[in-house]
Regions:
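C-terminal segment of classical bacterial N-terminal signal peptides
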Residues: 13-17
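Active-site-adjacent loops and short helices of periplasmic peptidoglycan-processing enzymes
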Residues: 18-165
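Sec-dependent N-terminal signal peptides
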Residues: 4-12
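Acidic, Ala/Val/Gly-enriched low-complexity intrinsically disordered segments
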Residues: 175-177
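Residue-level marker of positions within ordered structural domains that often coincide
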Residues: 5, 67, 117, 172-173
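Conserved small/polar residues in nucleotide/adenosyl-binding loops
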Residues: 166-171
Length: 177
């Protein structure tokens, strides 16, 4: 009886364990790279060197630059930022800050990270570098220091600008971020 139970367990264990393995997901992205974070081993990829628009991934670098400026003592989380008309008029996702108000760096960072706020990204850029384009230059300097050789930022939001090149990057460069 014990042998029959053991054989039954072995057979059912094999059947049920196979049923628990899901099919791999379909990925519609034209370019992607999946790595093991600890070993940096590539698990799967598709066109990882293809340059693509970054969109809101740009805000990771925006937040990184702001955090570094705080750590270097150039600004503090309590530093107040005047909101310009240009930032107030930003399209896309926003934290809905009003022109002429003052908002702390801390609150703007939350707006960038939690709400993907283009208005907050704009305000931080203006405070730190004087303009969005000057902040993009600063972002590109950081990208170069991080070894992101295929990266080009044109603004702190990731929004496309018809007058400028698109913020672009390759999936393999993003591993550095």
């Amino acid at each position: 009886m014990k042998k029959i139970a053991l054989v039954f367990l072995l057979i059912t264990q094999n059947i049920f364990s196979q049923a628990l393995i899901p099919n791999p997901p379909e990925v519609s992205a034209t370019s992607f790279l999946l790595i093991d974070a600890k070993t940096k081993t590539v698990i799967t990829s598709n066109e990882p060197n293809q340059s693509t628009g970054l969109a809101s991934i740009t805000k990771i670098m925006t937040s990184y630059v702001v955090a570094d400026q705080i750590s270097k003592g150039f600004i503090t989380e309590d530093t107040m930022v005047d909101i310009s008309e240009e930032c107030w008029r930003m399209e896309g996702s926003r934290m809905f800050i009003k022109e002429g108000t003052e908002v702390s760096i801390s609150e703007l960072l939350k707006g960038v990270i939690i709400q993907s706020g283009n208005d907050a990204s704009c305000a931080l850029a203006e405070k730190i570098a004087g303009s969005q384009s000057a902040f993009a230059d600063l972002m590109n300097n950081y990208a170069e220091q991080l070894g992101l050789d295929n990266t080009n930022f044109v603004n702190p939001t990731g929004l496309p600008d018809i007058c400028l090149l698109y913020t672009s990057d390759a999936a393999d460069d993003l591993v550095g971020v």
